[in-house]
Amino acid sequence: MPLPADLPPHERPRERLLRHGPASLRDAELLALALRTGTRGRTAIDMGSQLLHRYGGLRGLFAASPQELMSLPGLGAAKAGTLAAILELARRAAEERLMRQQAMSEPGSVKRYFKTALANCAVEHCLALYLDSQLNLITSGELARGTLARASVYPREVVREALRHHAAALILAHNHPSGSAQPSQADRDFTRHMQQALALVEIRLLDHLIVAGDTVVSMAELGLL
């Protein structure tokens, strides 16, 4: 692939972005602009393409930590830090959209948020959305990060965090790296215990979502809450 500087001006990613907008660029080209330069034998666009291939797309890239990015050939602290910052801004933008609306008035937005955050994580993560009495988002947070098989979350810790944020309701979500989004018996038991613990302090558990790849299962929609 020719270097971006060797392309005719109208074909270079930056010039195309400025002329036609960012939507006119492929994902690899947008990543190339963030990376700025390639390495010996690889253009920045090549590196962007390889990142997408390695992580199975943008959602997988979202789940990569800065340390993991730095372990890849040609990605030093500067490039990894820039990518991590851009990905975090995208995550916060998704969170900001939720904060502008009642969280439960657009359940599709909640599912998209958790799918973006969890779909391609290699280990289990458990996340929470903390809501006020009008079901507006107060903040979000990670409750646990575990092994391939499980993330340990204790009801008392969730209750403590909910009280700290003055939440009136919670939405929980975790991922199944195994690939099946169907709730296990352990998921059902955990949800029941969490609902009971939160009820003691008059906080509602509105839903518990399970993410596996492109699938998001709502335990509330299944009648398990």
Swiss-Prot record:
Motif, JAMM motif: chain positions: 174-187
Highest taxon of source: Bacteria
One GO process term, biological-process aspect: proteolysis
GO molecular function: metal ion binding; metallopeptidase activity
Keyword hit for Chloroplast: no
Entry keyword set: Hydrolase, Metal-binding, Metalloprotease, Protease, Zinc
Binding-site residues, Zn(2+): H174, H176, D187
UniProt keyword annotation of Zinc present: yes
Domain MPN residue range list: 103-225
Signal peptide stretch: none
Protein family according to the UniProt entry: Belongs to the UPF0758 family.
NCBIfam families in the record: PRK00024.1, radc
Name of the featured protein: UPF0758 protein Bpet3149
The organism's taxonomic lineage, starting at the top: Bacteria, Pseudomonadati, Pseudomonadota, Betaproteobacteria, Burkholderiales
